UniProtKB/Swiss-Prot annotation:
Belongs to the PRA-CH family. One of its GO terms (biological process) is L-histidine biosynthetic process. The gene is hisI. It is found in: Cytoplasm. This is Phosphoribosyl-AMP cyclohydrolase.
Amino acid sequence: MSRPTSSSESGIEEGLAFQPRFDASGLVTCVATDARTGDVLMVAHMNEEALRRTVETGDAWYYSRSRKALWRKGESSGQVQRVVEMRTDCDQDAVWIKVEQRGAACHTGRRSCFYRAVTRGEGGEARVAFVDADRLFDPADVYHKKS
């Protein structure tokens, strides 16, 4: 990984160097999908250290904005993500990882964090409906707190 320079726009888009562009908070957005099915599992953030550890270990590492801490996916729950492939977008400010997900990806115990569909109600208002919402584990048991 190297830091982009202001004159390397074409290098960012067409070059072979991985030069992630971190935002003002030092983060890039990461989309994690199931390598086998293509289903979106979660969206999280990585700082430089999380990105480096992900590349080095092959396990998904993230940065928690709420806890302001680095964490390895599955550290507490055992629901590990093994990275099969990592891609970056055209301007290298986001990454996409295809993972082998063991168990649930969501801290709510569900396979994916995207377990609710936004639908249009009879009056035209946006509503939420549960889809693919079965829990694979009880968060209270895994994290020892109320869900």
